[in-house]
């Protein structure tokens, strides 16, 4: 922990096409070895494909896909008297966004399609329709929180 007070949040610049900070965060998370151009190319083509399939505006379709993956509750380990309890906690909005982005990208990478563009667009389309790996992860997280509701009084 820093002694000089809280560390300031770094400002993320909005992306050039849609002027969205959310897209910039997604692209930065998608990027490997500092190759932002390649990550942007993959993302924008996936977004166009998503808009084509859904018939909605690209940004709106992306936001809906992200909303379908955002977790509202999660469990955190808490030690009480030698026992570790999984305590359900609410997820902060900032963490909701970062978790949903992380899950979407991880499950897109583990898909069977050929090429990252196809993988990402398929995962985004599945998330838009309320299915797929990332949505399943969210459901599992909510199920865990629901199962451990008895330990919610250990919240800190």
UniProtKB/Swiss-Prot annotation:
Higher taxonomy: Bacteria, Pseudomonadati, Thermodesulfobacteriota, Desulfovibrionia, Desulfovibrionales
Function in brief: One of the primary rRNA binding proteins, it binds directly to 16S rRNA where it nucleates assembly of the head domain of the 30S subunit. Is located at the subunit interface close to the decoding center, probably blocks exit of the E-site tRNA.
Gene3D superfamilies in the cross-refs: Ribosomal protein S7 domain
Record's keyword annotation contains RNA-binding: yes
GO cellular component, one term: small ribosomal subunit
Self-association state and partner proteins as the record states: Part of the 30S ribosomal subunit. Contacts proteins S9 and S11.
GO process annotations (BP): translation
Protein name, entry field: Small ribosomal subunit protein uS7
NCBIfam families listed in its UniProt record: rpsG_bact (TIGR01029)
